Amino acid sequence: MLDNPKLTARQQQVLDLIQNTMARTGAPPTRAEIAAELGFKSANAAEEHLQALARKGAIELVSGTSRGIRLHSETLRSIHAARSGPSGAGNPGSSPWVLPLIGRVAAGSPILAQEHVEQTYSVENGLFQHKPDYLLKVRGMSMRDAGIIDGDLLAVQATREARNGQIIVARLGDDVTVKRLRRTASTIELLPENPDYPVIVVQPGEPFEIEGLAVGLIRNTMLM
């Protein structure tokens, strides 16, 4: 747990919940989810704590989206320091992660093909609960309400498997997209987090692959 003397115990609980949810799902919780998890009477109570955290510089609130919560870089560094112990010395995993930044993906090419790598970034070891394999530059606003907006860098763990409700990187035909996965007995749907965008229904026989799982979100200001 991040020990920040500026925060009340309740604010610390909210901050820990945000960080843990982002590490587990790749997206921050909604106000309603915070209220339900911490036993608040309403989402308004959660909003009051979020506003206090924003005033104290622990988070940034993005208007117009239910998941518009971002951890500031100094908060992330403090969480990392707390995980590493008081000195961080002698930790064999203390070297930074060197991750390729993937830009536009050409049709039919593997995501990690060299021509897609714009540059590499060093990211603090342990910043996320699961080590990502690459960073994917987000284009567009289809995942806005999950707090993922144009220009963000999505931390992705390469995998072919995902559970319902997780945010994935999917290849559908020649296109690569970031969406929330929903599977039923008969269908696969890729859900946007923005009502202005349609649900993508994977048609029978249509080429579809899960390329990766979102394990976190960072911005350029959070990078070393």
From Swiss-Prot:
The organism of origin for this protein: Verminephrobacter eiseniae (strain EF01-2)
Catalytic activity: Hydrolysis of Ala-|-Gly bond in repressor LexA
Heme among keywords: no
Any one Gene Ontology BP term: negative regulation of DNA-templated transcription
Listed name of the protein: LexA repressor
Family affiliation: Belongs to the peptidase S24 family.
DNA-binding region: 31-51
Record HAMAP family: LexA
GO molecular function: DNA binding; serine-type endopeptidase activity
Gene that specifies this protein: lexA
Keywords, alphabetical: Autocatalytic cleavage, DNA damage, DNA repair, DNA replication, DNA-binding, Hydrolase, Repressor, SOS response, Transcription, Transcription regulation
The protein's Enzyme Commission number: 3.4.21.88
Subunit structure: Homodimer.
Site residues (Cleavage), renumbered to this chain: 107-108
